[in-house]
Design a protein with these regions (language model features):
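Terminal, low-complexity interaction segments
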Residues: 33, 70, 120-122, 132-137, ...
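Bacterial N-terminal signal peptides
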Residues: 11-21
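Surface-exposed, low-complexity/disordered Ser/Thr/Gly/Pro/Asn-rich loops and linkers
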Residues: 61-136
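A long-range scaffold signal marking pre-active-site subdomains of enzyme folds
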Residues: 31-82
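Boundary/junction segments of secreted and surface-exposed precursor proteins
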Residues: 26-44, 240-265, 269
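C-terminal substrate/ligand-recognition segments
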Residues: 140-142
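Short beta-strand elements bearing conserved aromatic residues within extracellular beta-rich modules
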Residues: 160-162
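Bacterial N-terminal signal peptides that target proteins for export
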Residues: 2-13
C-alpha cells in the first residue's frame, strides 16, 4: 500500500510539473502574421504581464541565455536558434536610465512607448522575434527605427543585427546591410534614432512561415536599452497565373498569312 501511495504521489508531482510547464510556455501567440504589418507599440494594453506576449500576435521576446559566452560579440555572428532560452519581457517599465535587468522590456511609461533590448551577463544575446506569412508576396521589405533609450552615464557600444530564416528550425541568416554597429550614444544622451530599411532576399518570398529577428549582445561596460520601434513589413502581390479561360489562343503567323480557299478553288490548280 505504501508503494502504491508513493507511486501516486510521484505521478501527481510529474503531472503538476507538466501543467506548470505548459502554463509557463503559453505566453505567446507565434501565429505567422500576414503582410503588410505595422507595430508601433502605442497600445499599452498589449503587454500587461511579465513574459506574456499572447496579445501581440506573431511577436515573442527571448532572453538569449548562453547564445554567447563572451562579452562584446558582434551579434551578426550569433545565428543559432536561441528559442530554448527564456521567453522575456519586463512589462510596464518607465525608467530606462535605471532599469538594470537585461533581456527584453516594454517601456510604456515614457512619452513614446516601445519594446527594447538590452544585453547582460545572463541575457547574453536577447532578441525580438517576428513570425510572418509571405505566401503570395514578393519584394518583401522591413523597416524599423532603433531608438537609444538610456540617457544615463552609460555609453556602451550597443550593436543590433537583423536576421531571418525559413520555417522554425535551423540557424538564422544575417543580413549585413541591416547591421547597426552602435545604436546608442552617450553619456547622458538618449536622442539617437536610427532608421533601417532592408529588403529580404528572394527565398523569403512566398513562404507560409518566415521568421525574422532583431538581436543584440552583452556589450563591454554597462549595456544600454535599444528600442525596436515603428516596425513595418510591406510587399507586393505575386500576380496570379492566367487561367485557361483568359489565356490568349496561340496563333500560327505563317498559316494566317495565306487566304483561305474553298475545295473547288484548290482542285482548279
Amino acid at each position: 500500500m505504501k508503494i502504491k501511495t508513493r507511486q501516486l504521489l510521484n505521478f501527481a508531482a510529474v503531472a503538476t510539473t507538466l501543467v506548470v510547464s505548459v502554463a509557463l510556455r503559453s505566453v505567446a501567440n507565434d501565429t505567422p502574421q500576414a503582410v503588410p504589418l505595422v507595430q508601433k507599440w502605442s497600445d499599452a494594453s498589449l503587454i500587461a504581464t511579465d513574459n506574456d506576449w499572447s496579445k501581440v500576435p506573431g511577436f515573442v521576446g527571448y532572453r538569449g541565455d548562453k547564445l554567447t559566452t563572451k562579452i562584446g560579440v558582434n551579434p551578426q555572428q550569433i545565428v543559432s536558434d536561441g528559442m530554448n532560452s527564456a521567453v522575456s519581457v519586463f512589462a510596464n517599465q518607465s525608467k530606462p536610465n535605471s532599469f538594470r535587468s537585461g533581456g527584453v522590456a516594454e517601456f510604456d511609461g515614457i512619452p513614446d512607448p516601445v519594446v527594447a533590448l538590452k544585453g547582460s551577463q545572463t541575457a547574453s544575446a536577447p532578441f525580438l522575434l517576428l513570425n510572418l506569412n509571405t505566401k503570395g508576396k514578393k519584394n518583401v521589405g522591413v523597416g524599423y527605427t532603433l531608438r537609444d533609450l538610456d540617457g544615463s552615464v552609460n555609453n556602451a557600444v550597443q550593436p543590433v543585427a537583423f536576421q531571418y530564416r525559413l520555417g522554425t528550425n535551423g540557424n538564422f541568416i544575417d543580413i549585413p546591410t541591416a547591421y547597426v554597429a552602435d545604436a546608442t550614444t552617450g553619456p547622458n544622451l538618449a536622442t539617437q534614432a536610427t532608421p533601417v530599411v532592408v529588403m529580404l532576399p528572394v527565398e523569403a518570398w512566398d513562404q507560409y512561415h518566415l521568421q525574422v529577428r532583431w538581436i543584440t549582445a552583452n556589450a563591454e561596460g554597462s549595456d544600454e536599452w535599444v528600442g525596436i520601434d515603428d516596425i513595418a513589413v510591406v510587399a507586393d502581390d505575386i500576380p496570379a497565373p492566367p487561367t485557361a479561360a483568359t489565356a490568349e489562343p496561340a496563333t500560327n503567323p505563317k498559316r494566317s498569312a495565306e487566304p483561305l480557299r474553298s475545295p473547288r478553288d484548290a482542285s482548279s490548280h
